[in-house]
């Protein structure tokens, strides 16, 4: 049985990934600061803390894994005006997305089987911008750069790719206008991201790439009335 570790496995996207992989027959472990669903083994872990990551891997006890999904991070992209932001606030966001991915990847590399895969969860905010999202955008942009570098460093034994989701929601509280903004005709769902993870886990000739999963939003020109 193939083994997968998903960080941030208790969140909206992480839960979808864990459930999809478990349904496909994977043995899945969720590393998160809180417990998630029963689809995965639950390992409490703060990915920004070096000792917590080491303890999580020791607790899990897996000597070999096939897939690492670096999905953990503070979901709220808006951080307020940069001129008013404290260093602690900046570090909190960047550490949760980027430093956490470094710490977990470092721990996972010796355990990844040949032919294994790493999938980093980036964001369309790394390639297009909104006001007051600087720490989030910087962290996600860093994840894309980390993906490129790791693909070269770890290949050909390990493949490394990233997914850049756009608007992903559980479907509640959305109206026709929300869906109509997307050329695909709808807002994305966690299952869309999970399908992309499954694809990248099996795509043997794909590495160092960023899969933009946004319903076409980054290709659409939007003009305000």
Where are the language model's segments positioned?
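Substrate-binding pocket helix/loop in short-chain dehydrogenase/reductase
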Residues: 79-82, 86-91, 178
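Canonical Rossmann dinucleotide-binding motif of NAD(H)/NADP(H)-dependent dehydrogenases/reductases
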Residues: 1-27
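Residue(s) in the substrate-gating loop at a strand-loop-helix junction
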Residues: 123
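C-terminal substrate-recognition "lid" of short-chain dehydrogenase/reductases
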Residues: 111, 186-213, 218
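Active-site helix of classical SDR
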Residues: 105, 139, 147
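Conserved Rossmann-fold SDR core element
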Residues: 144, 154-168, 206-213
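Alpha-helical segment proximal to the catalytic Tyr-Lys
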Residues: 110, 151-156
């Amino acid at each position: 049985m193939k083994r997968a570790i998903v960080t941030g496995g208790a969140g909206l996207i992480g839960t979808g990934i864990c459930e999809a992989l478990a349904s496909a027959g994977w043995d899945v472990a969720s590393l998160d600061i809180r417990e998630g669903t029963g689809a995965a083994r639950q390992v409490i872990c703060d990915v920004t803390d070096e000792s917590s990551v080491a303890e999580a891997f020791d607790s899990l006890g897996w000597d070999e894994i096939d897939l690492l999904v670096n999905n953990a991070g503070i979901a709220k992209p808006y951080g307020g005006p940069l001129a008013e932001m404290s260093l602690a606030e900046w570090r909190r966001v960047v550490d949760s997305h980027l430093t956490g991915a470094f710490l977990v990847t470092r721990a996972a590399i010796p355990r990844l089987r040949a032919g294994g895969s790493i999938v980093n969860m980036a964001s369309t905010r790394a390639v297009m911008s909104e006001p007051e999202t600087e720490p989030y955008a910087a962290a996600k942009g860093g994840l894309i750069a980390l993906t490129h570098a790791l693909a070269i460093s770890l290949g050909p034994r390990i493949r490394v790719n990233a997914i850049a989701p756009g608007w992903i929601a559980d479907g509640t509280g959305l109206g026709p206008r929300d869906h109509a903004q997307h050329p695909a005709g709808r807002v994305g769902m966690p299952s869309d991201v999970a399908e992309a993870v499954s694809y990248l886990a099996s795509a043997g000739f794909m590495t160092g790439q960023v899969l933009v999963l946004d319903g076409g939003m980054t290709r659409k020109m939007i003009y305000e009335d």
